[in-house]
Every structure is written in C-alpha cells, then in structure tokens.
Amino acid sequence: MSEFATSRVESGSQQTSIHSTPIVQKLETDESPIQTKSEYTNAELPAKPIAAYWTVICLCLMIAFGGFVFGWDTGTISGFVNQTDFKRRFGQMKSDGTYYLSDVRTGLIVGIFNIGCAFGGLTLGRLGDMYGRRIGLMCVVLVYIVGIVIQIASSDKWYQYFIGRIISGMGVGGIAVLSPTLISETAPKHIRGTCVSFYQLMITLGIFLGYCTNYGTKDYSNSVQWRVPLGLNFAFAIFMIAGMLMVPESPRFLVEKGRYEDAKRSLAKSNKVTIEDPSIVAEMDTIMANVETERLAGNASWGELFSNKGAILPRVIMGIMIQSLQQLTGNNYFFYYGTTIFNAVGMKDSFQTSIVLGIVNFASTFVALYTVDKFGRRKCLLGGSASMAICFVIFSTVGVTSLYPNGKDQPSSKAAGNVMIVFTCLFIFFFAISWAPIAYVIVAESYPLRVKNRAMAIAVGANWIWGFLIGFFTPFITSAIGFSYGYVFMGCLVFSFFYVFFFVCETKGLTLEEVNEMYVEGVKPWKSGSWISKEKRVSEE
C-alpha cells in the first residue's frame, strides 16, 4: 500500500503541515497504542507475487459483482425489445395484426434506466458516507431488487415496466458509485487499477450471459422470454447481498468514524499480514493524517465541489468529462441495439451475433486487467480513443456506401455486413481494454475522501444522463441518417483523445493520498507520469 506521507492543508498563502504524531498520541487514549511515526516512516507494503493477493482479489471481485447486475440488464434489454411476447404485451398493434414497439416507447424503456441510475447515484450514493460503503452497497442492491420485482410483475402495462426500470436504475446508480469506491479504498496500490477494473469485467460478464439467456429463451412464445432473465437477475442480486457480509469495510471510512482497530483489521485482511506489521502501522499513519487534515477543513458540502480550494473543481470537471466521453465513444450504440443493428446488416440470427460481441467484450476485459497497471491510465485512454475512431470510420463508411449496393429495398451485401461485424468486434475489443474500465478507475482514484462519494455521484450521473440520451434518441437518429451516426461518435472520440492528453493526470502506482498531493501541486497532465511525491523526493535527496 502506501508510504507515510505528510498531509497538508492550504489556507490562503499559508501552508499548515499535519503530521501523524498528534493523531497517534490521541489514539493512545482511545484504543490500543500505535507506534510512533518515526519508527515506521519508511515502511511500505511492498509489491508481492500475484499469488499473495488472492484474498484481496476475491474480495474485490465480490464487491465488483454489482457490475454484473448492471451488465445483465444491458445485455437482456437489447433482446427484450425484439422478442415477440414482450412486443405483444408492451407494444402496439399494426394493421396486419403484428405487434411492434414505437421508437418513442423503445427509447423510453431502454433509456429511462439511465435516468434512474443518475438519480440513484446522486441520492443513494450518500448512504456510503452515512453507514459505510459495505452497508450502503447492500441497501442500494435492495432498491434494485424492488425494481426487478415490479418489472417481473408487469403484465400488459408498459408504464408499470417503465416504473420498474426507473427504480432498478436507481439501485444500479448507487452501486456504480459505491462499488468502485469501496474497491479503490480496499485494494493495495500495486493492483488497485486492476481491482477497480473488476467492476467493468463483471459488467462485460453480465452483458455476455444476458445475451446468452436471451438466445436461450427467444424460441418460447410466452413471458418466459423475458421473465426468466429478470428472475435470474433477482437471484444474482440476493447473492451479492450475501457476499457483502464477507467483505471488510473501507479502512479509510473506518478511520473517518474513529474505528481505528477495525481499520487496522481491514487493512491486514486485505493485505494478508498481521495488524502489528510495520507496513500496516505506516499505512494507518498515512490514512489518519489525511483524514485529520480533511476533518480540520470542516464538513464537505456540495458547494465545495465547485470551488478551486484543494484543486477540487478541476477534478470534478475531469470526472464529468471522462464519464461523459465514455458514453460518447458509442459503445452503447452496439450494446443496447446490437440485435437491431445486426438485423439491419442482414444477419439471419442476430441474437447469435450479439453473443459473439458479448464474448469479445468479456474476453477483452481480461487484457485490460493487465494493461491498466502495466501501461498506465493515460496511454490506455489515448490508444483506445484513436483505435475506436478508426473502427467507426470504417464501420460507418462501409454501412453508408456498400451495405445496400442496389438500394435499401434490396438485400444487403453479405461481404459488407461481415466487414461491419468485424470492425464492430474490433471496436468492442479496444473499448474493453481502455475506456470501459479506466473511466471508473480514474474517477475512483482522483478525489479526496471527504468529497469522494459526492464527486463520484456527479461524474457517474453524467455517464447515466448521456446513456439515457443515447438510448432514447438512437432509434430516431438511425432512422434519419442510418449508419452515418457512426461519424458522430468518431468526432467525439477525436475530441476525447485531445481532452485526455491535456486534462487527465496519470495515477498509476500512486496511493490515493499521493494522487491528491499531485493535484494540489498542479502538475501538468502530460508530465504527471514522471511525478513523485514530496516525501519520496526528500528521501531520494
């Protein structure tokens, strides 16, 4: 984990250093004494072989399981809107007696989930500050379950299903804030990027298995088509609640609440060492100094997020932009409407093609678990933006110029369709190893503890709002301009490349306290990869 780092409070032109010695003296009157900082100043949790991290990896996978229920929803809803029983119950009848979902109703059913997520992230994420990240996660999963029950109970009223989507979205919004937060505050710094990426890994697993379940139920003629996938998600949510009982609470939250012995036990459990280990004492020293610094600054407010004090505002803006740009890569164009898209390119069984996309997405995320800590956040984001832009140029150009050589009322070109599917798979590969996990990693690492949940809620809320806009308007836009829609996302990807270069700092290999120090110092993003903390600079001298 981290070395001892002196925390600082900026007050006007004065700089006050807050050392951990007073905190240690205070603790000696409250709980079992902790050795003074001088004995362990240079103690640090060293990097270990991967086998030594199996305990914390398993814990982080359980915390990240919240991403699975989100991914399952994304994977299943893309099939629901094309299933016969779903359209019969919640759609409208044509003059020939067949049923369909209008563009408006499809957009609302698919997109409203994201509005629920945005609202849930902004409101329910606060539970993590009140009751702890772990208990907060359990509460928001319960909200999600309520929404699932309402959807399962829907019979023929589309607005009942619509309401259930809003409520389940609120639960997922809370999960999206609390799950990466708890992982980032629990995982050792050497594998923190990888562990936070588990959240995206679980999303991709959920999408893939959701596609598979749709394929398995599509031949039924009744509500089994969509109620079975929803029922399975209910079971998965119950499993996550049970799993949270085995997960330790965030040591940083515990220190903030004065539960120092519990914090030491949490750190020791995550790192497979004893609570007396010098590195645990040094880590506690660092966390306590940082928490005390934030406590002296007073209670956090929403207004503080929009002030320049402590370089908070630039980080809030960066988080909003990163999460917005993740949606504007165009990934959900494929994930929400993949089945519809591949119907358009002439695939006989578009459900099978969606499964292929799910496999590519899931398998590629394993690559991201390696690259995020090997190459760093900035390089992965920059490379992902460039690669995905190229994929969209080819996908859209082929779709516009070659897919229908004899007109849209004639059969499509199989060769052109195959090229589009190949570049769709390549797009998903590049997305899965870059923007998919790292957008969550960046926001989970960038904020100080006292404003973290609120800042993350705003950032992730921006993601959900863009998700709604894309989910709702995509049917209308594709009806109007077809595959030229891809050029819009290509432009967004070009913008994202330059935004990352000029505004996103590298956080690879830094403790959360060091990340905060780097932002306070005002390090230029393109120079952040070589930045080292003040304490390390002093020790090297």
UniProtKB/Swiss-Prot annotation:
BP GO annotations: carbohydrate transport; D-glucose transmembrane transport
Domain of life, source organism: Eukaryota
Protein biosynthesis among keywords: no
Membrane topology classification: Multi-pass membrane protein
InterPro entries linked: MFS_dom (IPR020846), MFS_sugar_transport-like (IPR005828), MFS_Sugar_Transporters (IPR050360), MFS_trans_sf (IPR036259), Sugar/inositol_transpt (IPR003663), Sugar_transporter_CS (IPR005829)
Induction of the gene: Repressed at high glucose concentrations.
Positions carrying N-acetylserine: S2
Extracellular topological domain residue ranges: 71-107, 156-162, 214-227, 348-350, 401-418, 478-484
Modification sites for Phosphothreonine: T29
Phosphoserine sites (modified residues): S11, S13, S17, S20, S32, S266, S539
Family: Belongs to the major facilitator superfamily. Sugar transporter (TC 2.A.1.1) family.
NCBIfam families hit by this protein: SP
Comment field (misc): Glucose transport is thought to be mediated by two kinetically distinct systems, a glucose-repressible high-affinity system and a constitutive low-affinity system.
Protein name from the UniProt record: High-affinity glucose transporter HXT2
